Amino acid sequence: PVSGRDLMLAVDLSDSMRTGDFVIEDEQVNRLQATKVVASQFIERRHGDRLGLILFGTQAYLQAPLTFDGETVNRLLQESAIGLAGERTAIGDAIGLAIKRLDLESDNSKVLVLMTDGANTAGEVTPLKAAQIAADRGLRIYTIGIGADEQIETTWFGLRRSNPSAQLDEESLRQIAALSGGRYFRARDSEALARIYEILDELEPVQRDLENLRPVVALFVWPLAGALLLAGLLLLPWRRS
């Protein structure tokens, strides 16, 4: 048998993810760019796992249902953009959507890795209520709070120090993880983020039969991408003939 699990990634696309407080290869990047680089490496290492992708902002969308096709999941992550799901942060709804999708499976180990840089400011369900339901359904949640604690900016009055992560609700993220039997991680820079994903690699796997692990190319429809394309076309100005 081959080890594996059902693992859903939930990535915050709210407006604050454009904050440029990370550095990768001596280049300053925003939080989503750093997430894409590190999570891409994580996805490539998940041989034998079924992976899924949820993108959330004001609303939560299932961008990739569970699949062995990690290449497609990675591509969809790389194509994501800040603001596509709205400017606010629906953490509870993202957890609820993961519960709904992962609950379709009964015997597999279920894991959600949720990354955010803020607090729950939108959605229909509170994060703690969603976390309790997740625990009841056997879904383990690992939460990652992303963002530096200090940023130095140049202003007309000289250098100014600020905390770009002032809105991060670490206490809620800790409670979400604790309720579901997971763990909370704090990623203040790209190195810490990479170490977190290495720790996640050590999650205990479930056993699967080899016959269930044949490579599959995902052919599912991408509803969020289609909806965004349609919205873009509708916003194009009409020209008079």
Model-derived regions, located:
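C-terminal signal-anchor/stop-transfer transmembrane helix together with its immediate cytosolic
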Residues: 1-2, 205-241
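Short beta-strand-loop
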Residues: 19-21, 47-80, 99-105, 153-170, ...
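Extracytoplasmic
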Residues: 2-8, 37, 46-51, 61, ...
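Extended, hydrophilic extramembrane loops/domains of integral membrane proteins
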Residues: 171-203
